[in-house]
Amino acid sequence: MALASSNATSMEELFGNPFRPKKERVVVEEKPFEYTPSAYVQMIDQMIGIKTRPWNPERTPIKPIQMLTLPEMSREERWIQWGMENCTVKASISGVLGVGVGFAFGLFTASVDPQLSMVGGDPTKQLTLKQTWKEMSSRMKSYGKNFGSIGLMFSGTECALETIRAKSDWRNGTYSGGIVGGLLGLRAGIMPAVWGAAGFAVFSTIIDHYMRG
């Protein structure tokens, strides 16, 4: 339209009345073109472009709208997840729980038959409160130490095997039971170590199969 107007004016100047006063031209200034990128272009430039981002001088990242996803984990939740995945933490927790189970088991057996491990005592006489407490404490310490060491060794070995193999299946429990049983039986000799490894491996496999089933 502007081109047609300019052509008409030029034709009038050429072939019009030369004595007629000339009309003043109205010059309309054109605004400079300003490019405003869309949200899609901004996202593409942020991901794979040159990342100039003149519309975002603070360089704040674009966060997608979460619709069907879980919210971000807090700092405390990340710490808990790290602790549950760390072999040292898992082994320590299993050891502490094993000590607690050993204490309870020792207390139960001592309350059922407190004279079971009394050596050199008269079984016909009734035990005093001091003797009963001594028997209970010694048995609780013994069971707690055994159960705690077994839980610590088994959980640590299983976590290490799971990390090395990068798999979480029943073989981790079987291998861990064999290793821990062999180490515990090795104190009595080679054959007890073999039988201990085999028995503990079978027991771990059965328990793992029951828990996973």
Curated annotation (Swiss-Prot):
Per the record, membrane topology reads: Multi-pass membrane protein
The GO annotation for biological process reads: protein insertion into mitochondrial inner membrane
The answer on whether this UniProt entry bears the keyword Ribosomal protein reads no
Tell me which GO cellular component terms the UniProt record holds. Answer: TIM22 mitochondrial import inner membrane insertion complex
- Signal peptide (from-to): none
Do the record's keywords include Lyase? no
- What's the main place this protein lives? mitochondrion
Q: Which residues cross the membrane?
A: 92-112, 143-161, 188-208
Q: Which GO terms describe its molecular function?
A: mitochondrion targeting sequence binding; protein transmembrane transporter activity
Which keywords accompany this UniProt record? Membrane, Mitochondrion, Mitochondrion inner membrane, Protein transport, Translocation, Transmembrane, Transmembrane helix, Transport
* Disulphide bonds in the chain: none
Q: Where in the cell is it found?
A: Mitochondrion inner membrane
Origin superkingdom: Eukaryota
What function does this protein fulfil? Essential core component of the TIM22 complex, a complex that mediates the import and insertion of multi-pass transmembrane proteins into the mitochondrial inner membrane. In the TIM22 complex, it constitutes the voltage-activated and signal-gated channel. Forms a twin-pore translocase that uses the membrane potential as external driving force in 2 voltage-dependent steps.
Membership in a protein family: Belongs to the Tim17/Tim22/Tim23 family.
**What is the annotated quaternary arrangement, including any partners?**
Component of the TIM22 complex, whose core is composed of tim-22, associated with the 70 kDa heterohexamer. In most cases, the 70 kDa complex is composed of tim-9/tin-9.1 and tim-10/tin-10.
The name under which this protein is listed is Mitochondrial import inner membrane translocase subunit tim-22
Q: Which organism is it from?
A: Caenorhabditis elegans
